[in-house]
Amino acid sequence: MNFYLLLASSILCALIVFWKYRRFQRNTGEMSSNSTALALVRPSSSGLINSNTDNNLAVYDLSRDILNNFPHSIARQKRILVNLSMVENKLVELEHTLLSKGFRGASPHRKST
């Protein structure tokens, strides 16, 4: 009985380690054979090291990882940009309305970012 319990727990531990290993490989940007992401592959020693990060990840590798792991992120980013431009237009309308009504707290000079 104890032998079967030990065997089952060791198999379970092996499966968990294998699952974590596969998940780690997927998160580090290794492309699987069925990946359809359109990203250029450049060696990791590209020389584009971001000095602001503690773990010295390459900026190009991070963007490639994002494209590989989230191929729908480009469409999502485009939708976010469209929504942001709509919000910006609404804020300009609101600012114009407030200035035309004589609200003194609104600044006529907006800083663009």
UniProtKB/Swiss-Prot annotation:
Glycans are attached at residue 83. Keywords: Cell membrane, Glycoprotein, Membrane, Signal-anchor, Transmembrane, Transmembrane helix. It is a single-pass type II membrane protein. Residues 22-113 are extracellular. Its main location: membrane. Specifically expressed in testis. Expressed by cancer cell lines. InterPro entries: KKLCAg1. Pfam families: KKLCAg1 (PF15204). One of its GO terms (cellular component) is plasma membrane. It is found in: Cell membrane. The chain crosses the membrane at residues 4-21. It comes from the Eukaryota. Residues 1-3 are cytoplasmic. This is Kita-kyushu lung cancer antigen 1. It comes from Homo sapiens (Human). The gene is CT83.
